[in-house]
Amino acid sequence: IVDNAGNQVGEIGSDKMDSYFWLKSLKSKKAGIELSSKRKGSSLVLRNFKGKEIVNVGIDGDNGGSFLINDRNGVSSLRMSSLSQGGGGMKFFNLRGKETVFIGTNKINGGQVKTYNGLGSETIFLGTDQNDAGLLSVNNNIGLSRAVVGVDQSGKGVINTLVK
């Protein structure tokens, strides 16, 4: 695809088992919009004028859907995707690309929220436990459980704190 002056601004093609379509402005180094269909899935990628990937809508490693939003430097900020055990989840990342919050479905089809510190250690778990009851777990800065609020199998409230 060329503009009125004959400059290439896009392309439609295929390479082996893959098909693609891309468009770019003359000021961009890389394609601003890229649509590809590959053997293992398809994706739509949007890049900023610096060529950094900002949005990616596609297929994740488990053959489910994925939506990734990056900051202006291409560092991950938010990912929404289907999960391998079913359900869906959202992950939020800090400026270094480390996961800080997860909101989604757990392995027993309940909901959960997890927070992580800058070191990647889980600090809070809030969600559904094995008894389909609520559970809050508070961890120290290296991810070791220090306080748990929940419900036992008979339906009574439980508060546990760990001193060690």
Task: Indicate where each model-derived feature is located.
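Parallel beta-helix/beta-solenoid repeats that form elongated, surface-exposed shafts/blades used
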Residues: 1-164
